[in-house]
Design a protein with these regions (language model features):
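Conserved alpha-helical segments that form or flank metal/cofactor-binding pockets of metalloenzymes
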Residues: 54-97
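Helix-loop segments that flank and shape redox-cofactor active sites
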Residues: 31-58, 125-142
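Leu/Val/Ala/Ile-rich N-terminal alpha-helices, chiefly Sec-type signal peptides and the beginnings
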Residues: 1-47
Length: 197
C-alpha cells in the first residue's frame, strides 16, 4: 500500500499508529511482569537463588507499574476498545514465542541471563528509537514514560549484570535462551512499528 500524497517521509504518527504502539508496549511490559513474577515466586530451593528472587520480584513490580502507565495512555475514543489494543506487536517475528520459552524455563539463572543481556537492552533500544522521532506536541505524555522507562531500564541492566556476575561465579548458566532471544531480535534491532508511516 502506497503512502498518501504528501506523506512521504513524514515524521509523525496517526492516533491509530500511536495507539497500536502504546498497546504493544503495554503487552510487552505485561509479559515481562508475568515472567519475572513467576521466577520470583516459582518452585525450587529458595536459599540457592534468594538474591535472584528478590531482584526478579523488584523487576516484576517495576514492569507491572510500567504496564499500568502504558495502559493509562491508551486512547479513549468512541468505538475503540482500549483493552483490544494491548497485543503482541507484529515484529519482530517470534517475540511472543520467545517469551513463552523464557517463561517455561526451569532455571531462573538461565532466564535471568537472557532477560538482562538480551531482552532489556532490546526494549531500551525500541524505546530509544521511538524517542528519537517522537514529537512533543502529539506524544508528550508517551515521551515522559519512554524517558523514565529507559532510565530505569539502564539501572536494571546494571544491577542485573552485577547480580548475575556474583551468582554465576559458582557455575555459568547455559546460553540457550539468550541465543533464542538474539535470533528473535537479530533481523531488526528495533521493532518496525516504531517507525511512522
Amino acid at each position: 500500500v502506497g503512502e498518501p500524497a504528501g506523506d512521504e517521509g513524514r515524521a509523525w504518527r496517526t492516533i491509530d499508529e500511536l495507539a497500536a504502539l502504546v498497546g504493544a508496549y503495554c503487552w510487552l511490559e505485561q509479559r515481562i511482569f508475568e515472567v519475572t513474577g513467576a521466577w520470583a515466586t516459582g518452585p525450587g530451593p529458595v536459599d540457592e537463588v534468594a538474591e535472584l528472587r528478590v531482584w526478579t520480584a523488584a523487576a516484576s513490580r517495576r514492569h507491572g507499574a510500567l504496564a499500568g502507565r502504558w495502559a493509562e495512555r491508551l486512547p479513549v475514543r468512541a468505538g475503540v476498545e482500549a483493552a483490544a489494543l494491548v497485543a503482541a506487536p507484529e515484529g519482530p517475528r517470534g517475540l511472543a514465542e520467545a517469551f513463552e520459552e523464557l517463561e517455561a524455563t526451569k532455571e531462573p539463572m538461565v532466564g535471568a541471563c537472557a532477560f538482562v543481556e538480551t531482552v532489556l537492552p532490546w526494549v531500551g533500544g525500541v524505546y530509544g528509537s521511538h524517542l528519537e522521532i517522537a514529537t512533543p506536541v502529539s506524544e508528550g505524555s508517551v515521551m515522559a514514560v519512554l524517558v523514565e522507562a529507559r532510565r530505569e531500564g539502564s539501572a536494571e541492566i546494571r544491577s542485573g549484570r552485577s547480580l548475575l556476575g556474583r551468582l554465576s561465579e559458582a557455575g555459568k548458566p547455559s546460553g540457550h535462551l539468550g541465543d533464542q532471544f538474539k535470533r528473535a531480535f537479530a533481523p531488526e534491532r528495533v521493532s518496525p512499528a516504531v517507525r511512522p508511516g
